[in-house]
Amino acid sequence: MSSNITQAFICDAIRTPFGRYGGALSSIRTDDLGAIPLRALMARNPQVDWAAVTDVFYGNANQAGEDNRNVAHMSSLLAGLPIDVPGATLNRLCGSGLDAVGSAARAIKSGEAGLMIAGGVESMSRAPFVMPKAETAFSRNTAVYDTTIGWRFVNKLMKEKYGVDSMPETAENVATDYKIEREAQDRMALASQMKAVAAQKAGHLAREITAVTIPQKKGDAIVVDQDEHPRETSMESLAKLKGVVRPDGTVTAGNASGVNDGSCALLLANETLAGKYGLTPKARVVGMATAGVAPRVMGIGPAPATLKVLAQTGLSLDQIDVIELNEAFAAQGLAVLRMLGLKDDDERVNAWGGAIALGHPLGASGARLATTAVNRLHATGGRYALCTMCIGVGQGIAVILERV
């Protein structure tokens, strides 16, 4: 590590619980949901002059509903950050939250920023239906799209050239192309659930969660303080599920990530401002890389992104102690592991559960990976962590962190 380069440090990180689709967090507006971890960061670090924040980068994939007017800045204002602190919403679909963390670190490393907030928010429960304007007057053929996930307003040329497979279809494509067995997918799903339930019981996940209080019209407020998606299951139960793309398919609701709600925020600083405001650096952001892949097999994106960030940082997979691989689907997660020469059950991967168990609120997930990775590094004494994700329309993203 060169002493001449400004370093970017993660000094704090916190998230909401991840709620099920239509679950406890579904009554909270997206911009209000995004404000919750920001408010928690401010409360946990009262000594910070929040007017010194250079920018707020928040990931968000939808932007068709209550997140439509730059939700990063709306959430910042709702959280009580000074009005002169700007904010920008990043949209790299599923990788948005991780991109926000990496981009904030880049701003600090460049010397243009000293104190940054990064994170992401997504309320998939509250994703609206949208419709285009009619092509002709008095048309009765207007389509209506559900913006929860996947394609809408499809470009015919895109469809002709690359196809517009749904997310489960891309996972089925990966399973076919890379010969990922149904049983292996179910094993990964079961392991994710078991690890998440164990992490909840051990209190590991509680370290990164701020409780959300939801007032009720009648009776006491509801307090949500843990993820709603983890559940007990078995190989027998998973094996009974039908394929979501076709009845004999391998991708099921049980071995795919959830449709969820949640938000997450991280505080990043250079060494000077961390010292000035009494912040304790927890991890250094070593590097970030992105990669493009064919949209029909978007799930393999983490493999080339990981190889790029390893080459960029001069590290090898053998030096990585903690791996947070976003489990969009077990099929793509297993394909990535095998492409990287790792075992299906590598103990470094998702030790506290992955997205199959914890959920995948698109724009928030990457920030959650970074948050969990930092906590796992400190819990295990490891040095380096890799966070990596696949991205719809054919991309991958990877970030490497170093424990401080």
Task: List the predicted regions and their residue ranges.
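Condensing-enzyme catalytic core mediating Claisen C-C bond formation in acyl metabolism
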Residues: S2-I28, I149, S234-I300, P304, ...
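Conserved active-site "lid/cap" helical segment
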Residues: S2-S75, A79, T170-R182, S192, ...
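N-terminal extracellular/periplasmic Venus flytrap/periplasmic-binding protein-like
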Residues: R15-T16, S27-I36, Q47, A184-K276, ...
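Conserved catalytic cysteine-centered active-site region
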Residues: I28, N60-L115, T148-W151, K161-M167, ...
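Active-site-proximal alpha-helical scaffold in enzymes
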Residues: L90-E122, A175-H204, A265-T272, L337-R338, ...
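Flexible glycine-/small-residue-enriched beta->alpha junction loops
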Residues: L115-N173
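Active-site pocket-lining segment
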Residues: E172, E208, Q216, V286-A357
